[in-house]
């Protein structure tokens, strides 16, 4: 099922790149200090 794919998605480099981009956007907008 879908939940079996979640670990693969989380461990994928693309997901980590997206997380980094989101984190950068949040920190640059002052969302997180």
Curated annotation (Swiss-Prot):
It holds the Pfam family Pardaxin. The keyword Ion transport applies. Keywords: Ion transport, Membrane, Secreted, Target cell membrane, Target membrane, Toxin, Transmembrane, Transport. It is found in: Secreted; Target cell membrane. Coiled coil: none annotated. Consists of a C-terminal hydrophilic region and a predominantly hydrophobic remainder. One of its GO terms (biological process) is monoatomic ion transport. It comes from the Eukaryota. This is Pardaxin P-2. The lineage of its organism: Eukaryota, Metazoa, Chordata, Craniata, Vertebrata.
